[in-house]
Structure formats: C-alpha cells, structure tokens
Amino acid sequence: MSAQQQCDLTSYDAMYYLQTGDLQLAVNLFISPNSSFSYSGNSGQSILQSLGTIIIWVYKVNGQIHIYTIGWQPIYYSLQNGCRANIYFRLWALIQIQGAWLASEIMNMPVTLKNTGGQFVGTFIPLHLLGFAIADFPSLSSGSQGYTHMLMSQTDGSIKLLPSAPGVLPYFITVGFQCRAGAYVLKQPCPNCIFVRLCVPTSNGIPYEVLMLICLLIYAGCYASYSDILGKNGLSTVGAGVNAKVPVTAIVYFDTQQYIQQNVVSQLNVTIQLYALIWVGISTTNFVILPEISQILKMPSGLILNIPVPFQAYPTPTVAIPRILTLITCCGTPYIYNQYFPCSFDKASTVTTECGVPLVAYPTISQMQPIAGSNVAFLLSNQSADFADLLSLNYGLLNLTTQQKVSLANQYSYTMTQCKKEVIRGTYYEECVKNVSSNLNQYSSQPASPQPNIPVDEILIGVGAVALIVIGTVALVLTGGASAPVSAGLDVAGAEALGSLLLDNGALSLSSLQEEGLANTLMQTSVSDSFESEDEEIVQNEPNSAKLVVFTNTNQPFTLTVTGTDITGTVTIQSGIADFDLTITLPSGVSVPISVPAGVIDDFTDDQGYTIYEQEDQPVRLKYSDGQVIYNTISQLGKKLDGFFSLLKKLLKYIAVALLSAIASILVNMFLFMPLVASIMTSIIQSGQGVSSGGTVTVTGQSTSTTLSTALSDIASTFGQIPQILEEIPVALASAYLITDLLTDFFGDLWRGFSKNLLPNKAVNVNIPQPLEVDLKSRLKAYSEAVISKNDKGEWVINKKLRGRFS
C-alpha cells in the first residue's frame, strides 16, 4: 500500500469531540506526504485565517457597538501524523425567529476535507449563503461566561442551551438528540415530526411574535460500523470493513411554516416537519440517497425563494455517477460532494418520513477516480484553481475556464476581506454580500436579475406606500361604523423593510421597476405622525391634504378632452352618468387602457351623496354627483376604517393569515400606482385644454371662475405632495408580518397617521395587467418589541414600537 493510499484511508477519524459538555469539531485535512504544506509558524496561522470568522453584522447595544460574527471560528490545530492535520473549529449555529433573533453556539458542524490523490472532495458549506440571524442579547462574552459553555447534556439525553451568566436572555432549545454510549443519535419523539421547544423571556412583556420560520441545519456525529449500516439498509456488507467504526453525519432541515402553535405566554411550542435529508458520511464507493431526494433529483430545477434553480450534476471526473446531489434550501446552500449513506436509527425499519416513506436507502454505485496534481495546502490558502473549482461549484457555476475560476476565487477573497473593513467603517454586511454576488454572477450561465444603478430607497418607499393604500381599500369594502382605540403612535423605522423583502427574494426586480418608470417618480421625505384623536374629523383643505377640485358642468353633455404626451382620452358626463375612456402611455412605451363604463356602484356612496366609480379590473377611481366630477376620495374613510379594525381585532386569530395573503396578492397588483399617477398629472398639466361644449371650471373655495389648466395645476401641485408623506408606510406591512396578534391595532394607528396627511381628498388606483407574486413568508430585516401595561380602563394592552432594521 502506497503512502498516498495510507493518507486517504482515514475513515476512522472522529468528527466530533466531546469536551466538558461542549461540542467541538475537527476538520480533517488530508495532505499528500510529498506536498509542501507546512503545519507551523505563519503558514499554520494563515490557514486558520483563511477558514476563519466572517463578520456579518454590527449591532448597537446600550450605546456600544458589538460586531457579531458567523462562520468557522478556529480554535487550534494539531498535526496528527505525516499526512493529516486536525483543525478544531466552532460554528455559530443559526435559528431565525420572526420578531426575535437568536444566534447561538448550540451545535458545531463538522466539515470533512479530503484529498484523494490531489483532487478535493468533501462537504463544504458556503457560510455567507446560509440564512442568518442576530441575537438580541446584551453581548457575546468569552470564557466561562460565553455560549461555548452553555451546552449541557440533560438527564433525558437531549441537548439544551442553558444560560450560565446573568444578563443573557434565557433562550434554550431542545433539539431531540439522544446521548447513547458517548454517541449522539438523532431521535424522533413522534413518528413524523421533531419537537422543538422555544422558551422566551417575559421580563419585557408577553412575547407576541408567532414563530413563522426556523431554518436549522444540524450536523450530528455518531459512530457505526460499515456492516451495521450497510446491513440495515439492505446493502451488501462484502468488503465493507466488517466492524470498522466510521463517522456519521446527519443533515436535517426543519421547516415550521405549516406547523405552528402558540401556547402559554412564556413558551412557544412548535412541531416541526422533518424533511428526509439524513445522510451518513462514509468513505466508500457507494452513494445512497433517500426516496424523497430521488424524486428531487429527477426534476430539472426547482423554485427557491421564487427563483428557478437547476439541480445539477457534479461536474468532475472523480465521481462517475450521473447525479450528485446539489441540495438547496431556504437556509442556505449545503452541497453534498462525498459518498454518503442515510443515518442508522435505533429502529431503522420503522422510522418513516412525514410522507410515510420508510427510511431505506436505494443504492447507486460510483467509483472514485483519483487525479494527481494538487494539494489541500494551496486550496486552503485560496490561491489555486482547486479552491476556484470548489467555489464555482458552491455557486452552481459550471463550465468555467481555469482563468475564470481563478478570477472567481480572487473576487471572492477580495470582497469578503473588504466586508470586514466596511463593517468596521460602519457599512453593513448586506452591501458586501451584494458585492460578492455581483462579482460572482458575471461568471454564471444563468445570471441573476440585473441590478441597475437606480434609487432603491425611493422604490422601496413607493412599494410600501401602495401596500397601505391597498389595505385601506380592502378595509373600506368590508366594514363601516364603529371606532377603535388608539394604543400607540407611529415610529419612523425600517422604511425599506417591505421593499427589501420583495427585492431580496426575487419577487420584484429593479429592472422591471425601472422599465415602468417607477424609479424616476418617487422622493424620500419624512412626515409628522401627530394625529392621535380617534374621533377627530378630517378637515378638508388643511395643510398637507389635497384640495377638493370641482368641475361644474353647465351644459349636457359635458365632455372633458385630454390630449397629452402620456395620456389621451375623454371624460363624458350626461344625465348624471360619467364615462371615462383614457389611455396612459408608460415611459417604457407600453399603453394601458383605462375605460370605466357608465354606471354607479351604490356600495361606495358616502354620506355626502357622492359615489365612486370603481371596478376590480379598472385602475382609476373617480366619483360624480349632481353635475360635478370630483377627483377625490370620500371624507369618512377614516371613520369606516375604525369600524373595520375594531371588528378585525375580535376575529384576528382566525383571519390573520388569510388577511396577510390578501395583502400580498393585492400589493403587487398595485405596486405601479405612483408612476402612473405622476404620468397622469404631468400629462394633464402639459396638455391642459379648455372645457369643450361651453363648460366652465370652478375651484371650491374660490369665488371666481378659472381655466381648466389652472385648476389642473392646483391638482398637480397638491398631488405632488403624495411622495413626501410615504416614508413611514412600508413599516406598516413589515410590522403586520412580525406582529400578527397586534396587527389590527398597529394598522389602525398607522392609518390614522397616514390619513392625517393624505386623506380625504383623492385616490387613484392603477392595476398592472399581469401581477407578480410575492412570498410574504420570507425573512424581513426588521424586528419589534412589545411592552404590556394597563390602560385607564384597567385593560391589559400591548404598546408596540418598531425599533429599527438591521441592514
């Protein structure tokens, strides 16, 4: 047996090391004896740095800046023999909770790096692609006070995260592991699920957040023999090494989107769906996948966060099987490159997935073909094409030239280094990730959506504004009458939260927004939110509200002809009925017809006798009464909305999810509201024509007649104020997602603050012909807090305040 073969036969090495209740991992580096790799001095330190911490977030706590990290945290390394080095790492595990963010060292993940004759194969996790969250606790201390020493082995065999120092929030997780003879084995408390208990502190009030999503990747280490694993899975044990002990790696992906319970105030009990992604790492020539994965691999691609992602084969001559799994989850992108078997349970024959499929492996045979010519030393220093090969595979970038791969690796290393510098300067990590993605996407055969240089903040504000307008429209249809109390004012924070949600997850692209002219029509400003009285009537023509403009017709029929560069058509009124027939040309050149047939919808008649012309498939709202066409909304909208929120509060637990879905659906239908409004008003100003058929135009509050162009200028001047009052609007939808139990109170307050500045004087709603889809269950970059107190009526209420955003 050659020296090279001896170095490759390392299947007996453990990945996990149990030390004083703390799980640590060893990365086994397989180096050929003739490599130039050095284990001492600066070279060893360089390796630790190359696999070291990645800074992702800056968080201000009590006036102090804390830099939180996620990534491999190198502890120390040791030379085990002439061809193998063990480097010990810690990893910050990730748990994402809507409204509360926890990143704790609850589990350390093993990575196996193997050099088979010079070719790198193994398990590699690109950490910056993992879904990440940040802990909302005072600090991450070190030594005995740190989270490193909070992993305790319980008497029931489970692993819990327990606090060991005052001031650290008492989050702890029960993950369903069983300690058996020194080996941790995944167990199932119930046949088709895993139970996770999340106990949250109550010192600052009832935790109102409903747990919407946990993305948790767990790598569990245990020992088993070749023959035991192969035999239980119906495979031949011939040549398997008989009783050889091998490391086992279990990869489990949890998804709680459809399994949510909220129990007592101090505890959230969540039953988690267990996906059958369970593997055992064995260095043999067999590759085994589970039934569900077999079905996934048959698909050419899948939707990940609304983005088509191909399931591709592993393009290397070292593995000859048709497909090696490229597993992509919403938590990140773990790539499985090595040979694996499904994990051995205590009762493997009786364990099934959530679909009732037994966890029995289906074998596929492959053969390792060693290739000489490289070593892991260069790979770890990020200087050779080996690292570039790995990196390109991690990003799903295939068929790259050697030069492109090396350039890819250089771009990656450079941008990640810049991230650390920018965080120190105060720039957020998200910008760095965008830089990394931008540099890497240039090599992809299927590049991501282009990111043009346009004012993103303004776009996000506009998108959020439309969301609130839509919510009000839906509310108006559903209710009227009663009044709801005001429990909290608005707080300016996280204006881009909603837009970031849409853009980050591919629901909207900046290029599509730019095509419709949205980027050129919005401004970012701030407004006052001092409107607090629940009974105060909205005063017409007050500051910050649009003026009521009345077109008085003295002859029948009365026809308003509009001829401009962007909008053309007519508005005809006869016998008390108005017909609207307009065409709007967008900046992209697309023409949108707007034709509101004659007729009256009585459900939209206010107490002043005005009616609103509005149909679901028509994008313009107007109203007409007694010979007057009024380009406004009704003045009692706020009062009717109070009734809606009062009613909805009683029914919230039953309709919250449905309401959010409706908001998401309607939101995208309406997201081009602002550019079309701007186009309409600009065109009317530019093309102001006199009133035909002898009509005259008067403006309410003025004693003399004026021309149509002057009246339209008044409209446009007040309409121009709309973009200036939208900064707080996106906070509404972001908070609705985070605070389901308090949804109605928050939106009630938000609507009052909004209506103070805009209502009741006009509304123009525009639908786009083909609405996009939005996934509101994706992450939001905002968080919130609740404080419980008694009001003057002796009732317990929760005051809400959106505190900010992370990026």
Swiss-Prot record:
Q: Which organism is it from?
A: Acidianus filamentous virus 1 (isolate United States/Yellowstone) (AFV-1)
Q: Signal peptide position in this chain?
A: none
Its protein name is Putative transmembrane protein ORF807
Where in or outside the cell it occurs: the entry states: Host membrane
For this UniProt record, give its keywords in alphabetical order, as a comma-separated list: Host membrane, Membrane, Transmembrane, Transmembrane helix
User: In what way does this protein cross or attach to the membrane?
Assistant: Multi-pass membrane protein
Q: Does the keyword DNA repair apply?
A: no
Q: List the disulfide bonds.
A: none
User: Which residues are listed as membrane-spanning?
Assistant: 210-230, 234-254, 270-290, 459-479, 657-677
Q: Is the keyword Transmembrane helix in the record?
A: yes
